[in-house]
């Protein structure tokens, strides 16, 4: 399946009317307007709305090296523009970085804050998933959101991505900043209960 098949399969097979993309599936197409136009047309053809592009592999927005962080911020610009073109409300980013929790928190406040400022000019949210590293501690990420304090910078709480941390507490801490929610389910009984 390709991204071009995604809207049709989403609608015809699953009866859904919205999709989220993963950047790694079209890494070299973020600035390819012909490709993006075709993808947008496929969505319109099947009545499917594009919601989020989950961006991976573009550098660390919480890198403690200012030069590396600047490069990561710039690498995300093309995804902000692609998200805007496709009609998405957000890009999902990662707040990873090496260093102490305090060092990476300060770097994340800078990196996410500056990217959110850029994205605001395009009407796009920058949302962070608790997606490994320090971001899997809800309090750490919630403090970053409070410091950034921008309406277009928020979270994408994932119920299954908290490290040795009360997932309900983590969700409670991140929900005030949430622009979406990601959940994982694994095993069900005959009544549909997990």
Locations of regions flagged by a protein language model:
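Acidic/histidine-rich catalytic cores of soluble enzymes
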Residues: 18-19, 109-194
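Alpha-helix boundary/capping detector
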Residues: 36-37, 69-70, 98, 109, ...
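Hydrophobic residues in well-ordered beta-strands that form the structural core
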Residues: 50-52, 92, 128, 157
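N-terminal pre-domain/capping segments
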Residues: 1-85, 103, 113, 120, ...
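Active-site groove signature of glycoside hydrolases
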Residues: 80-103, 122-135
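Active-site-proximal loop/turn and secondary-structure-junction residues that shape catalytic pockets
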Residues: 23-25, 56-59, 92-99, 132-134, ...
